[in-house]
Amino acid sequence: EPKENFTMEQLLWKGKMNFSYKYDYSAAGVRRSVEDSLQRLGLSSIDVVFIHDLSPDNGDMKDSYASYFEQAVKGAMPELSKMREEGLIKGWGLGVNTIEPILQTLDVADPDIFLSACQYSLIKHDDDLNTVFPKIAERGMSIFVGAPLCAGFLSGKNRYLYDGTFPEGVKEKLSALKRVADHHSVDLRTAALQFAASPDEVSGVIPGAHTAEQAVQNAHSFHAKIPADFWEELKHEKLIALHAPVPKV
């Protein structure tokens, strides 16, 4: 398949390997990671590289997040920009579960895109909506939304995100969302995916899927019709922000 016919993204992350690992956000480390990936993939370039989990919620980093971020500012970030100029990659950014690294990176580097996970969903969206999206818009950038279903919480799984806990109020909010969805005969998973894709700043949504059937269902959800009254009731009940973008009917 000719390279121009598909998009290839790459995460700088530990993955699952049969040997130990360490976080290396130096210039040499990031270049080695990208060049090794190009060799394994048999490609001459990668469209997007995300620095993954460079975030204060990363338990591996313990209290050393600031030093890891500083290493990336001096090493990985300028090196990725250099590789962009060389044509090895087309763009780079961060893939993180919190907004702080995104805001910090916007202040010190020239990224192209971000993957913001766990921050924009029917359950929780204020931080991305009010803080991240305006800054993204100012720079003419875009963002991918990760975990729009809150790791399955909005599609029937008995878990909220990834740490095994249920923050205060999330179960009650889910019940309220289900009540409105049932009233309008709307599939809540479908509504959650369309909600995540609605802001102009969002260029992609990444829902998880365990099976091919789930992947197909997710794709179909983006084309389903949802009545405007459903979104109006969510706003009336203060289940989503009044200024949150919703799908155009």
Residue ranges of each PLM-predicted region?
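Active-site gating loops and adjacent loop-to-helix segments of metal-dependent hydrolytic enzymes
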Residues: 9-15, 166, 170
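A short acidic, glycine/proline-enriched capping/turn motif at secondary-structure boundaries
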Residues: 1-2, 56
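Short, flexible, mixed-charge acidic loops at enzyme active sites
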Residues: 2-12, 159-160
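Short, acidic/polar
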Residues: 26-40, 97-104
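Beta/alpha (TIM)-barrel catalytic core signal, keyed to glycine-rich beta->alpha loops juxtaposed to Asp/Glu
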Residues: 54-236, 240-241, 246-248
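Active-site mouth loops of central-metabolism enzymes
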Residues: 15-31, 65
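Active-site groove signature of glycoside hydrolases
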Residues: 38-62
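Short amphipathic alpha-helices and their capping/turn segments at secondary-structure boundaries
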Residues: 30-47, 129-142
